[in-house]
Amino acid sequence: LSALEKETGMVMSNSPTVKVGYEVVSELPKEAHEHPMLSLDKTKDVGALVSWLGGQKGVISWKMDGLTVVLTYENGEMIKAVTRGNGEIGEVITNNAKVFANVPHHIPYKGKLTIRGEAVIKYSDFNAINEKITDAESKYKNPRNLCSGSVRQLDNKITKERNVHFFAFNLVDGEDVDFHNSFKYQLDWLEQQGFTVVEHYLTDSSALPDKVREFSEKITENDFPSDGLVLMLDDLAYGRSLGTTAKFPRNAIAFKWQDEIRETTLS
């Protein structure tokens, strides 16, 4: 395994070759984001989604319901993890991110890489954790709240036990890589680096309603919480040229279901 890891340049957090150093900290330091995070504009109307995309190609993906985390890698190694916080300032949780179930500690790419993704706790893990709690009042209300607390632990041994998964959904900074001016290419490239990437598809306005329907049909069987979809322009240069409003980036939009389709049962 060590030889394979050396050959690929990829070492996952759950690899037996990784010696995890558990650490207890007194507080989580706060840090300003190099690239502030704006919220997305939202719609519940598929027609509005189609109009928004117009003649462009877009990438549609899950809007996962956990805690957004920004990971930074340098020289192939994770050097920092920060929560979204208020979009301007987040909490540094590097020790905790290193024990997420599926995050690579080392990647083949050696330049500076900054990515965003969602830390989530799967329904199956959420239910298993709740089953061990006998007092009904003490049970966790939903996977999102449990995930938020798990990611922001002062003791990363607890984070490890909660089996937090990370799904990459955006590449913020990757120097000296030709991404062919394509957001889809960026996501596929992240997958090649060893990241679990949010499920996504390239689409156009004519295929978009069917894609939305296909996603909606998967909700009840998904093992991870989501609260809608995200549609992002595939053309990176065009997306950047649109800039932002005071509140939202113009290169992406969120689609919310009319009602939450999957409910978590507390027993």
How would you name each of these model-derived features?
Residues 1-267:
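RNA/tRNA-interacting regions in translation and RNA-turnover enzymes
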